[in-house]
Amino acid sequence: MRGNIAQLMQQAQKMQENLQRAQEELAKLEVTGTAGGGMVSVTLTGAKECRKVRIDPSILSDQEMAEDLIAAAFNDASNKIDAESKDRMGSATAGMQLPPGMKLPF
């Protein structure tokens, strides 16, 4: 029984270290989302902070379309970050059993 608890504690420590490393990597990550065939691009960090917005001047005359494309590009970048986060956090816990219903990232 004591061996199981010690092993569990070691696994928890390793998982915590792996999760911290994955979070640090995600914080450095930059992802670009696009919309309108590349007419709008939005670059976000892994923490979903906006770093850059690029808009093709040809769409600026249609405000509603520009707004829609900016939102779509932002959502594209956000979805890419979510997927990358899920992948990296999943790798950080590889081989470790999480309780049912527990999801990552926390």
From Swiss-Prot:
Annotated segments matching region Disordered: 80-106
Protein name: Nucleoid-associated protein XAC1110
Top-level lineage group: Bacteria
Gene3D superfamilies: Nucleoid-associated protein YbaB-like domain (3.30.1310.10)
GO molecular function, one term: DNA binding
Main location: cytoplasm
Pfam families from the UniProt entry: YbaB_DNA_bd
Function: Binds to DNA and alters its conformation. May be involved in regulation of gene expression, nucleoid organization and DNA protection.
Similarity annotation: Belongs to the YbaB/EbfC family.
GO CC terms: bacterial nucleoid; cytosol
InterPro entries from the UniProt entry: YbaB-like_sf, YbaB/EbfC
Compositional bias ranges of the Basic and acidic residues kind: 80-89
